[in-house]
């Protein structure tokens, strides 16, 4: 295969020039022209959107208030929160604004004022709540201290009661032991008429003396008699 044949196979455009395909060339030109026409043509929706944007910019410029207008409206708001329709029209005429624009400004200003009042009220309530919480903490601390003091007092009271019980128990035992001699010392003795006749004592007087004589006194009395030598006669009388 020669070189020219190879080039024709690789590059058919060289082998078949544009004159051989007139329809393809014409259709390509028409497509190019249609594409250019579409680019030049502007859709009505896009045009309306552009017009709306320009109009919106103008309206935004109209809505912006100058510093003097804002100050005047602020002063009017301090005097009266809500305006009637004639007053709105009057303010709009004085400031060179639309009555609807003045009404919207007052509506927004009332909303901001209400929001500010709510924030202030919330701050007051929160401060009061914090104060109550702090007071509650102090009261709880004081309650714990009082409970501790009460526990200490109860413990001290229990200790004192135990000491008093121990003291009372020891004293009662000692008293019981010492009461025996006392009761025995005051015990009576039996009247012996033999002794009364032996020593020549009257019966009534001797009975009265011996009735209130204790055992200790009686024993001492008998010892004295034995030492004086009278016991023999007494025992003889009993025997």
Swiss-Prot record:
Gene Ontology CC: nucleus
UniProt similarity note: Belongs to the HD-ZIP homeobox family. Class I subfamily.
SMART domains linked: HOX (SM00389)
Principal localisation: nucleus
Record carries keyword Cell wall biogenesis/degradation: no
Species of provenance: Oryza sativa subsp. indica (Rice)
Coiled coil: 107-168
Lineage: Eukaryota, Viridiplantae, Streptophyta, Embryophyta, Tracheophyta
Tissues with expression: Expressed in seedlings, roots, stems, leaf sheaths and panicles.
Name of the protein this chain belongs to: Homeobox-leucine zipper protein HOX12
Protein's GO biological process: positive regulation of DNA-templated transcription
Pfam families, sorted: Homeodomain
Gene: HOX12
Region (Disordered): 22-65
Protein's cellular compartments: Nucleus
InterPro entries: HD (IPR001356), HDZip_class_I_plant (IPR045224), Homeobox_CS (IPR017970), Homeodomain-like_sf (IPR009057), HTH_motif (IPR000047)
GO molecular function: DNA-binding transcription factor activity, RNA polymerase II-specific; sequence-specific DNA binding
Keyword presence, DNA-binding: yes
Record's function text: Probable transcription factor.
UniProt keyword annotations, A-Z: Coiled coil, DNA-binding, Homeobox, Nucleus, Transcription, Transcription regulation
Positions of the DNA-binding region: 58-117
């Amino acid at each position: 295969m020669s070189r020219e044949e190879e080039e024709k196979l690789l590059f058919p455009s060289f082998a078949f020039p544009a004159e051989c395909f007139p329809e393809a060339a014409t259709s390509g030109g028409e497509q190019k022209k249609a594409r250019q026409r579409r680019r030049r043509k502007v859709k009505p929706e896009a045009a309306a959107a552009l017009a709306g944007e320009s109009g919106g910019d103008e309206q935004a410029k109209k809505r912006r208030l100058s510093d003097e207008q804002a100050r005047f409206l602020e002063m009017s708001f301090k005097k009266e929160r809500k305006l009637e329709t004639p007053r709105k029209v009057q303010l709009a005429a004085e400031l060179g604004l639309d009555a609807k624009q003045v009404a919207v400004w007052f509506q927004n200003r009332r909303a901001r004022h209400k929001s500010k009042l709510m924030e202030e009220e919330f701050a007051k309530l929160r401060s009061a709540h914090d104060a109550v919480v702090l007071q509650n903490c102090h009261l709880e601390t004081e309650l714990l201290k009082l409970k501790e003091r009460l526990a200490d007092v109860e413990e001290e009271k229990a200790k004192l009661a135990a000491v008093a019980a121990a003291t009372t128990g020891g004293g009662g035992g000692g008293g019981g032991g010492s009461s025996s001699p006392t009761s025995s010392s005051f015990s009576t003795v039996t009247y012996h008429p033999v002794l009364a006749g032996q020593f020549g004592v009257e019966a009534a007087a001797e009975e009265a003396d011996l009735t209130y004589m204790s055992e200790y006194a009686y024993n001492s009395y008998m010892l004295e008699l034995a030492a004086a030598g009278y016991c023999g006669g007494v025992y003889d009388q009993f025997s």
